[in-house]
From Swiss-Prot:
Component of the EKC/KEOPS complex composed of at least BUD32, CGI121, GON7, KAE1 and PCC1; the whole complex dimerizes. Keywords: Activator, Chromosome, Nucleus, Telomere, Transcription, Transcription regulation, tRNA processing. The lineage of its organism: Eukaryota, Fungi, Dikarya, Ascomycota, Saccharomycotina. The keyword Ligase does not apply. Component of the EKC/KEOPS complex that is required for the formation of a threonylcarbamoyl group on adenosine at position 37 (t(6)A37) in tRNAs that read codons beginning with adenine. The complex is probably involved in the transfer of the threonylcarbamoyl moiety of threonylcarbamoyl-AMP (TC-AMP) to the N6 group of A37. CGI121 acts as an allosteric effector that regulates the t(6)A activity of the complex. The EKC/KEOPS complex also promotes both telomere uncapping and telomere elongation. The complex is required for efficient recruitment of transcriptional coactivators. It comes from the Eukaryota. Belongs to the CGI121/TPRKB family. It is found in: Nucleus; Chromosome, Telomere. The keyword Plastid does not apply. GO terms for biological process: tRNA threonylcarbamoyladenosine modification. This is EKC/KEOPS complex subunit CGI121. Its main location: nucleus. GO terms for cellular component: chromosome, telomeric region; cytosol; EKC/KEOPS complex; nucleus.
Length: 203
């Protein structure tokens, strides 16, 4: 099992590696958080990832939209709303116009044993020209950092195992919008509503 690799046609120069780890111990998560804060220049590349908990990510589309919006800001005159591309991804998952709140809700957390890890690589860098080797290296490096099980990221597993619908609907203010008993494609419906809430954030 290796990381899932995606590209957006609008950003051919970037390759996105996405990994899902489950059953990660709280001690391991604490260590990762500590190293993210205290990493020296020599350790920077080792922890140059976006670490997310899985509590409020409803689908892959929800995640991809956040990555896409972050790359759009990164490459345009709009610029980032946060310090870097990694925190921008976290911020763009949130419907709340507060970076600190987004980091708290969506960042890696000891109370969630599952984490999604994202690595964005600029292919214009000659060192990153061989994608297969890069993908294998990303997976190998992450397994050295994370003591958990790497599994496939798929919508059914996300929806059935990670999401607390009551908390999700409360965060995205969807309690009066969606009838859980009448929606045939509930995950798709909630995904679109969550993305809409993020797009309209601050208005």
């Amino acid at each position: 099992m290796t990381s899932e690799v995606i590209k957006f046609p609008q950003f051919p120069e970037f390759t996105i590696h996405i990994s899902l780890f489950i059953n990660v111990s709280s001690e391991n998560i604490t260590t990762i958080k500590s190293n993210l804060i205290s990493a020296t220049d020599n350790d920077h590349n080792k922890y140059d990832y976006c670490f997310l908990n899985t509590k409020y990510i409803i689908s892959k589309e929800h995640l991809f939209q956040s990555i896409y919006k972050s790359l759009l800001n990164y490459t345009s005159k709009l610029g980032l709303s946060t310090r870097n591309l990694k925190s921008e991804i976290i911020y763009n998952l949130s419907p709340i116009n507060n970076v600190g709140d987004a980091l708290k809700r969506f960042g890696i957390s000891e109370d969630c044993p599952n984490c999604i890890v994202i690595k964005i690589i600029n292919n214009n860098n000659k060192e990153n020209s061989e994608e297969t080797k890069i993908s294998e290296k990303v997976t190998t490096d992450l397994k050295e950092i994370i003591d958990g099980e790497l599994i496939e990221l798929n919508d059914q597993y996300i929806f059935e195992n990670f999401i607390d619908l009551a908390k999700f609907r409360k965060l995205y203010k969807l309690n009066d919008v969606v009838d859980l008993n009448k929606e045939d494609n509930l995950q798709g419906r909630l995904t679109r509503l969550a993305i809409g809430a993020c797009i309209l954030r601050g208005y």
